[in-house]
UniProtKB/Swiss-Prot annotation:
One of its GO terms (molecular function) is ubiquitin-protein transferase activity. This is Ubiquitin-conjugating enzyme E2 S. It catalyses: S-ubiquitinyl-[E1 ubiquitin-activating enzyme]-L-cysteine + [E2 ubiquitin-conjugating enzyme]-L-cysteine = [E1 ubiquitin-activating enzyme]-L-cysteine + S-ubiquitinyl-[E2 ubiquitin-conjugating enzyme]-L-cysteine. Belongs to the ubiquitin-conjugating enzyme family. Pathway: Protein modification; protein ubiquitination. It comes from Homo sapiens. One of its GO terms (cellular component) is nucleoplasm. GO terms for biological process: anaphase-promoting complex-dependent catabolic process; cell division; exit from mitosis; free ubiquitin chain polymerization; positive regulation of ubiquitin protein ligase activity; proteasome-mediated ubiquitin-dependent protein catabolic process; protein K11-linked ubiquitination; protein K27-linked ubiquitination.
């Protein structure tokens, strides 16, 4: 089994162990950390889909990999649960600034996990790894939300507490989670959440501007 533990200086290993122990005992809201006893540089994590988003009700498995240059270099983040999101690539790679140019050694693992959870609330289509998801987010939010919600139901265990419990058991056993109840979660995760309202407002503004322009053109022709 490949591991970067042997490549890290002893004082870095102690710092990582301390933070991981703290995160395990006192994790951020909606996040759980499952340390890999065989490899401290491979952190297994679950993130609950935030309310008011198409990911609500889902439980998403991910991992953080700490490289040999950590913390001088940022960790790499991957979703293990399939997800339809502009900033998540086909292989699960997560694209967020804190894992790239905004990284500093002082940020720590907790900050990274909180930033990734925030990415589920506020996707960034301008740095999309999934171009289709990024395009739909900007042009057709309802379709984007429907696609994201469908994958959440199928892969994210979005069947209420029973589905989330199964996803948690799958993480502990190292197997892929599956939904026990693929029924639509509806509610705030649907097309009426804050993300939908934000994009609906942007579309309304664009539509109003277009109508105004068309009206001016029509008047010029008179």
């Amino acid at each position: 089994m490949n591991s970067n533990v042997e490549n890290l200086p002893p004082h870095i290993i102690r710092l990582v162990y301390k933070e991981v122990t703290t995160l395990t005992a006192d994790p951020p809201d909606g996040i759980k950390v499952f340390p890999n006893e065989e490899d401290l540089t491979d952190l297994q994590v679950t993130i609950e889909g935030p309310e008011g988003t198409p990911y609500a009700g889902g439980l998403f498995r991910m991992k953080l990999l700490l490289g040999k240059d950590f913390p001088a270099s940022p960790p790499k983040g991957y979703f293990l649960t399939k997800i339809f999101h502009p900033n998540v690539g086909a292989n699960g790679e997560i694209c967020v600034n804190v894992l790239k140019r905004d990284w500093t050694a002082e940020l720590g693992i907790r900050h990274v996990l909180l930033t990734i959870k925030c990415l589920l609330i506020h996707p960034n289509p301008e740095s999309a790894l999934n171009e289709e998801a990024g395009r739909l987010l900007l042009e057709n939010y309802e379709e984007y939300a429907a696609r994201a919600r469908l994958l959440t139901e199928i892969h994210g265990g979005a069947g209420g507490p029973s589905g989330r419990a199964e996803a948690g058991r799958a993480l502990a056993s190292g197997t892929e989670a599956s939904s026990t109840d693929p029924g639509a979660p509806g509610g705030p995760g649907g097309a009426e959440g804050p993300m939908a309202k934000k994009h609906a407002g942007e579309r309304d503004k664009k539509l109003a501007a277009k109508k105004k322009t068309d009206k001016k053109r029509a008047l010029r022709r008179l």
